[in-house]
Every structure is written in structure tokens, then in C-alpha cells.
Amino acid sequence: MILTLDVGNTQIFGGVYEGDNLKLTFRKTSKGTLTSDELGLFLRQVLRENGLDPKKIREVGVSSVVPDINRTIHNSCMKYLGLEPFMIGPGIKTGLNIRGRDAANLGADRVADAIAAMNIYPDRNLLIIDFGTANTYDAISKNKEYKGGAIQIGVSTSLNALIQNAALLSKVEILDPGGAASLTTEGQIQAGLYYGNLGAIKEFITRIKKECFGNEESIVIGTGGMGRLFESAKVFDVYLPDLVILGIKIALEQNRSV
């Protein structure tokens, strides 16, 4: 079995594959201090509690956008699984042609998203929107060339910034409020978060499609934990919540001989 870990600024999203079958997904916060022992014990426990034997994990693949945690990830996998993790980063085989002066700094999670999307939809123009701490937009041509993208503040990050800087505003549940005008402060915050982001998403889709693909057809893919919030708004052609961990698995398989 293959263990995949996507390490983000807010949480770690993990998955276990047996062949092409996704057996398990799980999440753990990545905020605060995380030791290799804490993470290693967590991984063993979550596997066992879901009926999976940690000893049957043969490979570990990781995408990380939190450099400070990388050593922790490495040490926990070595100590508790006896495996050295494969890390997505510059120099690996991806099948993606990334050009530009900042190519080496494209997030590992975004690279993994692209790898998976190209595998699912070969020879198609793709726009991938990943919703997390930040919303990222990545355009991939049908020739597997990275055309560019954008980074937007995420929904939960927007809410946290708002309540930290406005004394009378409190945290609310993030959801579709069903209307843009509300009689309550809670509903007004929810409307601002939802419709403000929805409007930005639509604008980014329109502009990126035009700039990167012209009049050619493209597939818009939504992914990431917060992506489900906008699924009913029909801004995506498809919502694939596990895209990043699939991409990690494929990258690991492509680089076994490296």
C-alpha cells in the first residue's frame, strides 16, 4: 500500500492507496508544534483504527508547502513506518512543462494537482482551482504546459482576518447563506464570505480561460477541502476532492526508478 500526505499550512490531508483503490482518507491539523513522535504515532493509530496494518505500507509520498515540517515528516516516516518518504520537489519527473523564472517555487501541492488532472483528462486544457488556506488557480494546456495561475486568499483565512481586525465581529459557520442580503450580522458575514469568493472565482475563471486558452475548450476542476462549498454554484465542470493525493501517488510511481 502507498501512504500519501499533503502537508498544508492548516492541515495534513492523507490517503492510503492499494493499487488504484483509495482505501482511506484522513486529516490532521498542521498548526502549532508537531513532533515526529506525535505524527508517527498518529499515522500508526489512524491506520489501525481503519483496519489497515502499518507494516503493509510499502511507500510514502509527500507534497509539502510547509518547509518547517518536512524534517518532522521524514523522521516520523523513518521511525514509525521504516520508510523514507518521496518528496515532490524540483528535479522529479512530473510530465508537466513548467517554464518561467519562478518555476522552482510552484507549490508541491499544485504540481500534484496538475499531475493527477493530466492523468484523468489527457490532451485537454485544464483549469484547476484548489481551495484551502489560499485558493490557487492553475492553467495547464493540452500539451502539458503550465500556462500560469493565481493565488487568492482562502475563505477561512478571510474569516480569520476579519474577526481578528474587527472587535465586534465573531466567527461564523462558513456556508451558502442562500441570499446576499441578511438582517443578522452573522448572515451578513456569511454572505460576504460566500458571494465575495464566488464572484472572485467566476472572474478568475473567465479571465484565466481567455488569457491562457483563448477560444479553445477547457475543463474546470475544483478540489480542496473548501471546494465543496461552491460545488452547487456550478462553477466547476467537476469537483475532485482527492485530486492532490492521487497526484502524489502518480508522482511517486513515475519516479520509482529515479
Curated annotation (Swiss-Prot):
SUPFAM superfamilies: Actin-like ATPase domain. It comes from Elusimicrobium minutum (strain Pei191). The keyword Cytoplasm applies. K(+) binds at D130. ATP binds at D6, V7, G8, N9, T10, Q11, I12, F13, T133. It catalyses: (R)-pantothenate + ATP = (R)-4'-phosphopantothenate + ADP + H(+). One of its GO terms (biological process) is coenzyme A biosynthetic process. Pfam families: Pan_kinase (PF03309). Homodimer. It comes from the Bacteria. This is Type III pantothenate kinase. Pathway: Cofactor biosynthesis; coenzyme A biosynthesis; CoA from (R)-pantothenate: step 1/5. It is an enzyme of class 2 (transferase). Keywords: ATP-binding, Coenzyme A biosynthesis, Cytoplasm, Kinase, Metal-binding, Nucleotide-binding, Potassium, Transferase. GO terms for cellular component: cytoplasm. Substrate binds at G107, A108, D109, R110, T185. GO terms for molecular function: ATP binding; metal ion binding; pantothenate kinase activity. The keyword Ribonucleoprotein does not apply. The active site is at D109. Its EC number is 2.7.1.33. Its cofactor is NH4(+); K(+). HAMAP family: Pantothen_kinase_3. Belongs to the type III pantothenate kinase family.
